[in-house]
Amino acid sequence: MPKRSDIKKVLLIGSGPIQIGQAAEFDFSGSQACKSLREEGVEVVLVNSNPATIMTDPDMADKVYIEPLVPEIVAKIIEKERPDGIIAGIGGQTGLNITSELAEMGVLEKYGVEVLGTKVRSIQEAEDRDLFKKAMERIGEPVPRSIAVTSLEEAEEAMKELGLPLIVRPAYTLGGSGGGVARTHEELMRICEMGLKRSRIHQVLLEESVIGWTEVEYEVMRDSNNTCITICNMENMDPMGIHTGESIVVTPIQTLSDHEIQMLRSAAINIIRALGIEGGCNIQFAVRNGEYRVIEVNPRVSRSSALASKATGYPIARVTAKIAIGLTLDEIRNDVTKETPASFEPTVDYVVIKIPRWPFDKFVKADRTLTTSMKSTGEVMAIGRSYEEALMKAIRSLDIDIDLGYNGKYVPWTDDDVRELLRTPTDERLFAIYQALRRGFSVEEISQLSMIDPYFIERIQNIIRMEDELKNGLTPDRLRRAKKMGFLDSRIAELVGLSREEVTDYRLSLGIIPTYKMVDTCAAEFAASTPYYYSTYDEECELNPSDNKKVLILGSGPIRIGQGIEFDYCTVHAVTALREMGIEAHIINNNPETVSTDYDTSDKLFFEPVTLEDVMNVIEKERYWGVMVQFGGQTAVNLAVPLEKELKRRGLKTVILGTSPDSIDIAEDRERFNKLLNKLGIPQPKAGIAYSPEEAKRVAKEIGYPVLVRPSYVLGGRAMEIVYDESGLELYMREAVRVSHEHPVLIDDFLQNAVEIDVDAVSDGRDVLIGAIMEHIEEAGIHSGDSACMIPPQTLPEDVIATVKDYVRRIALALDVKGIINIQMAYKDGIVYVLEANPRSSRTIPFVSKAVGLPLAKIAAKVMAGNTLREMNLNVEPEIPYVAVKEVLLPFDKLPGADVLLGPEMRSTGEVMGIDYNMGLSFFKAEMSAENNLPLDGIVFISVRDEDKAEIAEVARRFVNAGLKIIATDGTSGYLRGSGVPAERVRKIYHGSPNVLDYIRRGEVKLIINTPTTKQSVKDGFQIRRSAVDYHVPYITTVQAAKAAAEAIEKALRGELTIKALDEYHREVRYRAL
């Protein structure tokens, strides 16, 4: 049936901040849906709280609201915009939950808003564990025996009936949050208590265990005509019992028989029809010896559908959006081939592997075990002609400096350690399989211990055989076969005892070069018009390089802490800029979740690891005019110097555009940067460099404790710490010296209680455009990526702001920056200190762009390609009459055992933005978006160190005046009462009940303010902070943030929150000419 004429305006709900379990895949699907609806002439209103997304760009939708994703706020947007319909299945679990709540509240009915695509009833049947089970039984599809419970007593009863182990699955949660595998009665009670709390409807399903069965997923699509197609089938290398988002996944299925594959395909189609889902949907099965169980259905676009889209080239979100407004599969054109309809099932003639990227390098103390709830932050995808090739490419895409054969880290493992690692799934299991094979374990033994199919273990055995052959010397035949299997020249060089350059030159002299194949949805049966390629060492090459002026942009790889979706945002903007200038733009990247790897984002996409060899291979083929490294985060910046060297070595004319690699090195290399600042006469904190533990002690003593220590060249403050005394320094040196290979340790004076400042600017070598000056709410010493910050600054005097601008201009011009620069400063006792400069895109670029209405990344890309700021009329300075606040989302609730204290190591996974006409309301909105709802009534618990008591008394008085009640520990409550602030005393944890934990567990405490001191109180505080996370109570660990919270609560009690679209705010920006 043709598209509906009554649907003229549609509301799309985004998925909010990047968090574990819900990453960039929803920006990718949301952006695709926006384009798809607007192609059909439908007006799109978008609401999302995450500024770092492409979908919240003003030109992606007709109206963009960056507001908290809570039903009350979305209801106000509906009241204002009056959309005809709402699409729930694009914004992940957040979008589904909000749509369900709006329906329950009667808002949709009141304003006549129809749920388009998958209906609320279908969402409920798929998400409510009990309804889902009944629906499956009704159509005769086998499900594991299970019982849905809503209390711990019911869980005890269910356990008696089903036995242990049990899988606990909460209803309506994200990434398996709150669930797990219970092997004992105690574990069951603990997991059920968390799960019931996390579930929106206070329900969990206890399910008989199918741990060890093969996990298989089908991505299916259905339209209103009841036409169904399967887009892709995927097999998890890891068996059941691990969340599919935590598993290594391969498509097509490798180990099932043709009969089993067809049986599951029929079941998948049967299920999507029975549930009445319209659009894309993901169905998970457990399979063993020819029988199967249906595990769950996601009635929405998901992480797996992003993977399926990228693996096959079939644009699931685009088609889902068109189905939602009434089109059918045979009416929708396949945009990749331009000639086949969307009702043709895609076929693949290659192997695709996805590996998750975990944050354990940042959370050394967190539990690494993988279960049914997610811990990974992102993922990589690789394409090859064989399983081995795809696996090798995927491992190097992870950017963890380790490949299968890397032994350094694993030498100390004993055989018993290896057995334990095979038995317990962790992020290291793949490497444990390699180690076990190297140590002579049989394939059967490894398979029995790990429950992983022998097929996958044999593929790793093949890689080991190839390594052993190479150790016998390099011959043309061996080199050719090793390259076919996915080996890098650098790895081959290690095995044969040559340098990487020698292997590369020998390979090129033999004419062994990669060919590029196209991903075209149809195994080359039809011509594809969207060029999307992967490399392999095969005979025929499908790549036809053009003679146009063209640029290669390096992407940022998998989402991880410290390198998030912000860099993908910048990559996409760079493409737009180049296209506007008539330059062909190509991307190399390997993250299946992002907009940059969408089939129609760039002129050509290379789905490849971002390593020196893989990038050079593409450059050799395409002969670019230039390469851009500024937008791909540290991954790309780290390649700048080696890439320039290799281009010169091979005599290629391609240049690195923008700031020169030498200038990047000056900014990254501490000694060179210090010299530059001294020459410019710009103050910096006292600092020194140490190459040994003894030297470190001497330097720290000269500077005076506390000091900030870190290795040189890092991203996201990895292995950075504030050290208060010599014993702390000794411990750090033991831990950190491992981090820096030939790089020394940097030691800085730690500026206590300074105000931290962040500036994003674009320079063309003559003029400097300052996008914004951000004032941090947390004091210096907390990583800038973890700090809340505000535009414009709220407490800095005018003369300080003038100094900041002056320093930014002088540093940018001295470094001859062409493109973006981010500079971090600290203000203390009347002096502005420069902490660091990064001549690359920063994680605040999207936030600044949304706040002031200037697309900085796009402007920077044009400057790098030769435009000047004056030519673009951008020799200006923006001034805004409102306040924008950026707040971060921390992953602690998904990582049991990690402490929630912030420090110089970056911990956050994503960000949100609050925007209103004063700092209080903007901060209130930002906290609401970050799931830290500030209370307007109830109890506030305060426990602070002595030096904070004077400041906190004033904050506490403001809370009491706002009608909140205060409880505090001994010292703090005494001090508050002495200052005339009423406060009730509660016991410290180790003094028995009633203590603060009892209040938290009873749900009476609505806000916790706890600044830590000594190690004992850090531990005591750890218990308080940890239970705050577990019971979802907002907590604050700095005095500055407590002040901001007080102001926010006062303003929210007095004033109305403004609900306005981004373009309405941007119209109020004034530009001052310079």
Curated annotation (Swiss-Prot):
Which parts of the sequence bind Mn(2+) 1? Answer: 284, 296
UniProt: Mg(2+) 1 binding residues: 284, 296
A GO molecular function annotation here is: ATP binding
Region Oligomerization domain, annotated ranges:
400-543
For the ligand (ATP 2), the binding residues are 710, 749, 751, 756, 781-784, 824, 836
Q: Where does Mg(2+) 4 bind?
A: 836, 838
Transmembrane annotation, as ranges = none
Give the span(s) annotated as Carboxyphosphate synthetic domain: 1-399
Which GO terms of the cellular component aspect does the record hold? cytoplasm
Q: Where is this region: Allosteric domain?
A: 934-1074
Note the superkingdom of the native organism: Archaea
Cite the binding residues for Mg(2+) 2.
296, 298
- Annotated region described as Carbamoyl phosphate synthetic domain, given as residue ranges: 544-933
Protein name in the entry: Carbamoyl phosphate synthase large chain
Source organism per entry reads Methanothrix thermoacetophila (strain DSM 6194 / JCM 14653 / NBRC 101360 / PT) (Methanosaeta thermophila)
